[in-house]
């Protein structure tokens, strides 16, 4: 039983091998190889322009929205190379949700924001939608704050509430993976704390990949940390080791604040 538990714990959702990405003639990611573990929080850190956000957007192929992008290598999700698979993009993005730096709720009601995804994927019965909306808002620590005003415009919420609504919207499609691109950088400290608590509560149910500039945040909430520099992966490992005993001097210099 113990061996089975260890095997389950270390299952990889993503296996990236020699992955390269170009914007036109400019190479933005160079020979990236890493594994992202199931039901772990992985923080992606590094200075501005190092490729963090570019990398995370490849994980659900949002990068394909840019016609100038070219990719090579292996980007394996559930054992399928996303660069060669015929997997439907809508199904991929249902399985791999995305939360952006700036809260981006739809200009619709709170209810409709959360129900939108399930409707797109064929759920029509009001009772079922009601249950999904409630469970998703509870999962995002927002239900108690909005349960009596679900028909209010989502844009009437505070910035922190809007970001948690966007997380609820991502949860509503029952994803396997949540990608978060600096989800707290536009929030005040109190809202940031709530989102960090939310991420901690979700880690047992979802694989989470978060881009952050905040070293303290990465140390607080992640199980593993990957350090990117100038389009390359310098190292990845358990967060405690990355911050206390990194293998590379460049990592040590970055996490100790000597450059950023």
Curated annotation (Swiss-Prot):
Which terms does the record give in the GO molecular function aspect? ATP binding; ATP hydrolysis activity; ATPase-coupled phosphate ion transmembrane transporter activity
Q: Where is the ABC transporter domain?
A: 8-255
Q: Name the CDD domains on file.
A: ABC_PstB_phosphate_transporter
Q: Name the residues that bind ATP.
A: 46-53
**Which top EC class is named for this enzyme in its record?**
translocase
- How does the UniProt record describe the way this protein sits in the membrane? Peripheral membrane protein
- Catalytically driven reaction(s): phosphate(out) + ATP + H2O = ADP + 2 phosphate(in) + H(+)
**Keyword annotations:** ATP-binding, Cell membrane, Membrane, Nucleotide-binding, Phosphate transport, Translocase, Transport
Q: What is its EC number?
A: 7.3.2.1
Per its UniProt record, what PROSITE patterns does this chain match? ABC_TRANSPORTER_1, ABC_TRANSPORTER_2, PSTB
* Xref: Gene3D superfamilies: P-loop containing nucleotide triphosphate hydrolases
InterPro entries, per this entry? AAA+_ATPase (IPR003593), ABC_transporter-like_ATP-bd (IPR003439), ABC_transporter-like_CS (IPR017871), P-loop_NTPase (IPR027417), PstB-like (IPR005670)
Where it sits in the cell: the answer is: Cell membrane
A GO biological process held by the record: phosphate ion transmembrane transport
A Gene Ontology term for the protein's cellular component: plasma membrane
Family in the record: Belongs to the ABC transporter superfamily. Phosphate importer (TC 3.A.1.7) family.
The task this protein performs is described as: Part of the ABC transporter complex PstSACB involved in phosphate import. Responsible for energy coupling to the transport system.
- Quaternary structure note: The complex is composed of two ATP-binding proteins (PstB), two transmembrane proteins (PstC and PstA) and a solute-binding protein (PstS).
Task: Identify this protein by name.
Answer: Phosphate import ATP-binding protein PstB 1
Q: Which gene encodes it?
A: pstB1
């Amino acid at each position: 039983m113990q061996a089975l538990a260890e095997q389950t714990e270390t299952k990889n959702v993503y296996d990236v091998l020699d992955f390269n990405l170009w914007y036109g003639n400019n190479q933005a990611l160079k020979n990236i190889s890493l594994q992202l573990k199931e039901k772990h929080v992985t923080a992606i850190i590094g200075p501005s322009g190092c490729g963090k956000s570019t990398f995370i957007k490849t994980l659900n192929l949002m990068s394909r929205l840019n016609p100038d992008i070219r990719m090579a290598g292996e980007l394996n999700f559930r054992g399928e190379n996303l660069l060669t698979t015929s997997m439907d993009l809508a199904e991929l993005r249902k399985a791999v949700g995305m939360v952006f730096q700036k809260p981006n709720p739809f200009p619709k009601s709170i209810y409709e924001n959360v129900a939108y995804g399930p409707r797109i994927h064929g759920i029509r019965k009001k009772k079922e939608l009601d249950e999904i909306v409630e469970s998703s808002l509870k999962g995002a620590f927002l239900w108690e704050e909005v349960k009596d005003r679900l028909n209010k415009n989502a844009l009437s919420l505070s910035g922190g509430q809007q970001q948690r609504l966007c997380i609820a919207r991502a949860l509503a499609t029952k994803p396997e993976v949540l990608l978060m691109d600096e989800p707290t950088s536009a929030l005040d400290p109190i809202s940031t704390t709530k989102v960090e608590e939310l991420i901690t509560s979700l880690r047992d149910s979802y694989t989470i990949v978060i881009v952050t500039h905040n070293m303290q945040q990465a140390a607080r909430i992640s199980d593993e940390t990957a350090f990117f520099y100038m389009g390359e992966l310098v190292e990845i490992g358990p967060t405690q080791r990355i911050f206390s005993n990194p293998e590379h001097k460049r990592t040590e210099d970055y996490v100790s604040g000597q450059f950023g």
